[in-house]
């Protein structure tokens, strides 16, 4: 089960999210009516115009702990941050697709995933593939995440990075 995060708060950069169905990428177009804005005195249309609308990231749900409930199993939200859960676990640290100039005197650069392609799994599939495009002033990258949820969730990450200039 896919759940999209709305742009807003700390997460102001929209990302493109696509679903791969029968080997074709299908964009998941932003629709304000997908979200419940509650009692806020702002219409979804106003929010779209103010923030540019869009999705900030996504999470996937899977029956980790029970066959009757879909638990959050992985989340991609903000810059190149992602994290996954195993059965009975709680979130701890997040991982990053790439850290550039971390703890340097000139300041850290935060590369960001700008587009995702989520391969729609077949019924009863044991894994899901997620592809991502990473971009920053210093680097570009292409990622393949193979997520295998379970007692010990495993995520195989393959990345191809291309540097535009030297980094620390």
Question: Residues of each region from the PLM?
Answer:
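Extended, loop-rich substrate-binding clefts of extracytoplasmic carbohydrate-active enzymes
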Residues: 92-150
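Generic structural signal for short, flexible, solvent-exposed coil/loop and linker residues
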Residues: 6, 47-49, 87, 105-107, ...
């Amino acid at each position: 089960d896919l759940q999209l995060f709305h742009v807003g708060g700390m997460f102001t950069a929209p990302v493109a999210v696509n679903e791969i169905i029968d080997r074709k990428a299908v964009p998941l177009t932003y629709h304000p009516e997908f979200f419940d804005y509650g009692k806020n005195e702002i219409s979804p249309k106003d929010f779209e115009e103010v923030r540019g609308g869009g999705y900030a990231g996504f999470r996937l749900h899977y029956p980790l702990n029970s066959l009757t409930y879909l638990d959050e199993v992985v989340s991609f939200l903000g810059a190149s941050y992602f994290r996954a859960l195993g059965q009975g676990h709680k979130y701890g640290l997040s991982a990053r697709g790439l850290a550039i100039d971390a703890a340097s005197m000139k300041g850290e650069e935060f590369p960001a995933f700008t587009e995702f392609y989520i391969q729609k799994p077949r019924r009863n599939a044991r894994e899901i593939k997620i592809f991502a495009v990473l971009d920053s002033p210093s680097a570009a990258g292409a990622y393949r995440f193979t997520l295998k949820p379970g007692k010990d969730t495993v995520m195989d990450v393959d990345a191809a990075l291309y540097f535009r200039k030297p980094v620390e």
